Amino acid sequence: MCQEGLFRLALSSPRKQTACSLGERRTLAEALGLVDSTLESRRDPNSSLQKEFPQHQDEDQSRAAAPQDCLLRDVECIAQKLEASLEEIHRGAREPREEREQRTLGDALENARLEIEKLKDNLMKLKESGTTDLQRAREHNQRLDEEILALRNRVRSLDSEKKVLGEMYLTSGEKTSCQHQGELRELRQNLRRLQILCNSAEKELRYERGRSLDLKQHNSLLQEENIKIKIELKQAQEKLLDNARLHSSLTAEWKHCQQKVKELELEGLRQTQSLKSQQGLQEKLAREKSKAAEAQEKILDLQQKLDHGRQVCLSDVCILRKKQLEEEIKEAKSIEARLQQQCQEEQQRRILLDQDINELQTQVRALQDKEEQQEAVNSQQQEALRKQLERERRKCEEYVKSNQELSEKLSNLQQEKEALWQEHGRFLEQLGDHVRNYKDKHHCHKAKLQKVKDRLTHELEIRNKRIKELEDETGKLQQKIEMEKVFQGQIMAQNDILLLEKRKLLEQVTDQEELICSSKCTISAFQSKASLLDKENQQLQENCLRLMQQIGLLEQIIRSIQIRREEETVITDNAAFEILKKILPLQNSSFSGTGFVLSAENLQETELHKWEGAAAIPKSPEPLSRSQDSESGYINVTSLKETHNTQGDQKPEL
């Protein structure tokens, strides 16, 4: 019954609207005829009216044409809306809504069950992957700890080797320059090994840092997966809520259709109101036209008064005012000329207006023809609509029968629906229990993950501290290596100085040999003194051998002097004099007293220089003192040789 009432309202409203539109068109045609009659009757020769008339005419035409267009558009829109509403009603009648709701609910429940099963599988997989990842992380941490311990042991072994090498280097200062070079090569090789080990340690540290970053990324991925699982659960809950909302939305659609029908009725009322407003506008136009007629009458009265005034002025004119009148006549003539020009222009405008009026009349006739055609079409459409209404009434009767059957089915479906709602409630309770259990497990899993994360972060902090300590140790080792390099450079410089001193000594030896050759030449000249010179040479050779043997003793004495500088200075001088006396007895020696004194003085001077060097550089290393000892030994030998040569030169002179 409700559907029949709706159909009647929907079909009665277009009939009323078409009848109203036809009545409005007729009234508009009558108004246009009246306008044409007034336009033809009011073509008077007045400038003011001719200026105002085209404006009023344009306004009348625009106002008369605008409502026609609006009515046509409104009729078309209403017809389209009615067709759309009828199609929606037919579709709703063809397919019952409760069956749709049941189907959608069944599909939604099946989809929700499938999604829940998928989520459970994903959770199991994530748990298994999490346990395996934790085991791998623990194994990796153990490996890293072992590698760090191995690195520490390597560093300790390198430190011990370095200390041993330093001690060896200190003890090997007494050896020759060849041994120094060999040790330097070994040290360089060891340094290279240390550098290689440091580089390998740095690479291992970088690799450990990369592994730690990978572990952090893996933890972040696990967190993201947990978040995704939460989102999927929320989506499943939202889908269930959407399925519950579908039922309410379908009922809302039926109400919306009813509101649309009411809106269509309101639009019909609005159109009637618009027609009333148009009638009021037409009345205003008639009033304005009456006002224009009154203005024309006033203009005619004014012209009559002007003519009467001219006649009175001609009868009462005096001779004194002739000149003024002549001037006024001239002005009037000029004004008349202007008025004639204006009249000509107005005549041209009238011709144009007549042409426009003729065109408008032709347009009005064409519109009337179109209206007659539209009336015929509307009559045909009304007959077609009546036929459709009869068909629809028959269909409605069939729909009523089908609705009765559907009502019976609906009762059965409602019972089934109640059973489904009960099952749905049970399912929701089970789902709530599952969700609670899942949340509890998820919280436990979160707590475990947080504990693991805390452990990992603590271990990472400890590793970073260890890495920093190792880096500091490597920096210290590098500083030590640089210090050793500087120390090696100093040693090399000292070795170069010693080589230069050796070269100087060799030059001195060659000079002495040249002197010996010159002495041999003198000996060959003085054959008489050859025997004496041979003996002296033999004695000199013996003395040189003794001196070379006792150079070692002198070096030992100099070392003991360095250890006991302050206590045994006088004792060493006396011992040196006694040793020299023993080596070079005064009775058998060919040395003079002055040469001996010079050699003693040279020894004292060298000792004084040594004392001054030790006071100036108290913190110099031991190899420098050893080099100074060797230098002093060389100087003593050269001084003795010089004294011997001077004595040898003095003897032949004597």
Curated annotation (Swiss-Prot):
This is Coiled-coil domain-containing protein 30. Residues 38-65, 614-654 are annotated as: Disordered. Belongs to the prefoldin subunit beta family. Keywords: Coiled coil. Residues 625-654 have a biased composition (Polar residues). It comes from the Eukaryota. Pfam families: DUF4686. Residues 97-244, 276-559 form a coiled coil. The gene is Ccdc30. Residues 53-62 have a biased composition (Basic and acidic residues).
